[in-house]
Regions:
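Transmembrane helical elements of multi-pass membrane transporters/channels
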Residues: 17-36, 136, 147, 170, ...
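Small-residue hotspots at the loop-to-helix junctions and early N-terminal turns
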Residues: 45-56, 130, 134, 197, ...
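Hydrophobic residues within alpha-helical transmembrane segments
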Residues: 20, 24, 54-57, 97, ...
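Short runs within selected transmembrane alpha-helices of multi-pass transporters and secretion channels
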Residues: 69, 137-155, 163-171, 196-211, ...
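Small-residue-rich hydrophobic transmembrane alpha-helices
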Residues: 48-112, 144-158, 162-163, 263, ...
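N-terminal transmembrane alpha-helices
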Residues: 7-38, 42-43, 59-71, 75, ...
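Short alpha-helical transmembrane segments in multi-pass integral membrane proteins
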Residues: 1-19, 76-142, 188-246, 302-367, ...
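Helix-terminus/linker motif at the lipid-water interface of multi-pass membrane proteins
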Residues: 27, 31-49, 117-124, 180-193, ...
Length: 452
């Protein structure tokens, strides 16, 4: 044990230093998700069901777009590791253009889905609530992608604190706006679920504006602005961004799609089941976002060492990240387990929803190991720019394994919403094992040749 600690000690410290600000920023996102669910749930159980459907659909678009923006991190991380600051700024400029194009493409796709929303089998009483909320969130997609471009750039140059403070500030603004607009305070109309959407749109616009101001005015970004403004558009960088971004986007998108399609299946079971699913998603985002923070730090460290062609420390960074991820998972799972009988009541006044939430805790706890495993090694592979096989792994894990298992357990066996959730441990753990194997294979150290 002591040997393991001495081997990985410096990596633990560096990952915590890089990852902690990202985790804190994600805690802000978690608190926002909790606040959204709490405020909407106490305003109306029907609105909570509508929010569950729309948020699941948009989580797919946002995670997909975020995955695409991740293509910037290994590029910037490698350039930063070799002190090429101007090209890193040029990469940011190209990334913002690519992100904007992806955002517009997603907006078109989500508009087509909106026009067919009544064909997805959701309860009729939810449709009038779903539509306006959906449109407001649709308008915010472009700003999510612009923010992601700046965030992945600052993460890649190991400045994780800037995005943390902007995220925290934006989330505080969003929560205040939620309270005012959902309940109709300060003389404004009571908008309910629509008010939550308007507040989200406004806060996302503000966060992008703040990031632009900081990048333009802060002295620490001067050496990057030279490349940003003078080097201009590059076909090679643009192609590299797309080559890295699309596979990661599809890998993360397929993972999220398994949750989103599961939400559609759960919607067939009624409003109560859908509301309980939304509460459990808010809880599961708590652990996912914490893992995400550490995973992002793994990607940055791995890309820095990859830029230096230091394979030993590439491997050590990844495995140190997994050690920290497992420790974090045990602590978070223990907290959720101890609070299992109270969680549902914190989010809604409905006893039926609260009871159903408690029944979903077991499958949630089971998939924590798999979630930590797949996040760690997906980010490690992203750090070494080995991303193409990730799409195949995601397809097998989430579409061949997870979704069929969810349908079988939920509807064929008749376990209902618990059965649908039982699929997640199978999908996430199988993905994690395949991603680990790929990373292990791609970073094998050459065996020393025997002396002759």
């Amino acid at each position: 044990m002591r040997h393991i600690y001495s081997t990985y000690k410096e990596h633990y410290k560096a990952l915590i230093f890089l990852g902690l600000p990202i985790v804190i920023g994600q805690i802000g996102v978690i608190v926002l998700g909790f606040a959204d669910t709490l405020m909407i749930g106490h305003h109306s159980t029907i609105e909570l069901g509508a929010a569950s459907f729309v948020n699941n659909v948009f989580n797919l678009a946002i995670i997909f777009s975020t995955g695409f923006s991740y293509g910037l991190t290994p590029i910037v991380g490698g350039l930063y590791g070799t002190r090429q600051y101007a090209p890193a700024g040029q990469a940011l400029r190209n990334s913002l253009l690519a992100n904007l194009m992806v955002a517009l493409l997603l907006t078109v796709c989500m508009t087509v889905l909106y026009l067919n929303i009544e064909r997805l089998g959701q309860p009729e009483e939810l449709i009038p609530l779903i539509k306006p909320y959906y449109l407001v969130l649709l308008a915010s997609l472009v700003f999510v992608m612009l923010f992601n471009g700046f965030k992945q750039f600052t993460d890649g140059i190991t400045d994780t604190k800037t995005a943390m403070w902007i995220l925290l500030g934006g989330n505080v603004l969003n929560i205040i706006g939620n309270y005012i607009l959902i309940y109709g305070k300060l003389g404004l109309p009571e908008l309910g679920l629509l008010g939550a959407g308007v507040s989200t749109l406004f806060s996302r616009i503000v966060m992008v504006i703040i990031f632009i101001i900081i990048f333009m005015r802060s002295p620490r970004f001067v050496r990057y602005k030279i490349g940003f403004f003078r080097l201009g558009w590059s076909r090679a960088i643009f192609g590299h961004l797309n080559g890295l971004g699309w596979p990661v986007a599809f890998q993360m998108g397929m993972e999220t799609a398994s949750f989103s399609l599961s939400a559609i299946m759960i919607g067939w079971l009624g409003t109560i089941a859908l509301a309980s699913h939304q509460v459990m998603l808010a809880i599961s985002q708590f652990t996912f976002m914490m893992y995400y923070g550490m995973g992002a730090a793994v990607a940055v460290r791995v890309s820095n060492f990859k830029g230096q062609n230091d394979i030993i420390n590439v491997r050590r960074s990844a495995y140190a990240g997994f050690h920290l991820m497992i420790t974090l998972g045990v602590v978070l799972s223990l907290i959720v387990f101890l609070c299992r009988n109270y969680l549902g009541g914190w989010f809604t006044d409905s006893q039926e929803v609260a009871a159903m939430v408690t029944s979903l805790i077991f499958p949630f706890l089971v998939y924590q190991f798999g979630d930590g495993l797949q996040i760690t090694f997906a980010n490690a592979l992203r750090g070494i720019s080995d991303v193409k096989l990730m799409m195949v792994i995601a397809f097998v894990a989430y579409f061949i394994i997870s979704l069929p298992v969810g349908y079988f357990c939920g509807f064929v066996i008749g376990w209902g919403v618990v059965g649908v959730w039982m699929a997640f441990p199978f999908g996430l753990t199988s993905a994690g094992l395949m991603l680990w194997w790929r990373f292990h294979h791609m970073t094998k150290l050459p065996e020393p040749h025997p002396k002759t």
